Amino acid sequence: MDKRPSIIGRMFDRIAPTYDLLNTILSFSLDKAWRRAAINLLEIRAGDTVLDIATGTGDLALPAADGGGKVVGIDISRQMLLRALGKAEEQDLLTRYSVVQGDALSMPFRDETFNSAMVAFGIRNMNNLEAFLAEIYRVLSIRGRFSVLEFSLPERSLFRWIYVAYLTYVVPIIGGLISGDYDAYRYLRDSVTGFPVPEALEGIMKGQGFRVVLSMPIFGGISHLYLIEKR
């Protein structure tokens, strides 16, 4: 898989118009509750500065901003950011949500800028996990927390087989038909099945200086929620 930022950015530019619709369809609307759980873990207080990585169309950032946080979203895709800003305007959240187009491995923020950070379904798109986590560590304040929501693979063999079959045969067809981009949804399958298992990802997180506060499978293990803290 080619995870160069330029390639990922162009892919998300192409699927941006149907991104929210397909998230709802392919997750059976479960992704909204999962995102809310990721936000709640951070216990955001009024005035906290929060970084949302791979902010996309703002589905994680906007509820956090609505809860009182001052959220900065970064994403490599301009088209995704334009949709996020449109939704922020509709929800009257532009005073609490701003965006930056850029690479999450080299962010234009000073050290210890943010009280907390979060990412939903974006960490698997990073082409260097160690460098990405080091960059998050840099921009977080001491004891700052980072919540990570990402797809995973169920441990139970039957459920795992069903889920992989869904990713292999159903997701690319539905995603391709609606978005017009079959390759993007084949990439989704490959990026999920090729991503480190939770125990391996926890090891990478610890290797970059984080303390793992929580690591929890969701919905039988098709997604996983992590909360880590800067020491």
Task: Say what each PLM segment does.
Residues 18, 28-48:
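Conserved alpha-helix/loop element of class I SAM-dependent methyltransferases that forms part
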Residues 1-18, 167, 178:
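N-terminal, positively charged/glycine-rich alpha-helical extensions of SAM-dependent methyltransferases
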Residues 115-129:
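A short SAM/SAH-binding and catalytic strip from SAM-dependent methyltransferases
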Residues 130-145:
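A short glycine-rich, Lys/Arg-flanked "PGG" loop and its adjoining helix->strand segment in the class I
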Residues 105-116:
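A short acidic, Gly/Pro-enriched loop at the edge of an enzyme's catalytic core
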Residues 49-53, 57-106:
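Class I SAM-dependent methyltransferase SAM/SAH-binding core
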Residues 149-204, 208, 214-216:
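C-terminal alpha-helical "lid/dimerization" subdomain adjacent to the S-adenosyl-L-methionine
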Residues 209-211, 217-231:
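Core SAM-dependent methyltransferase catalytic element
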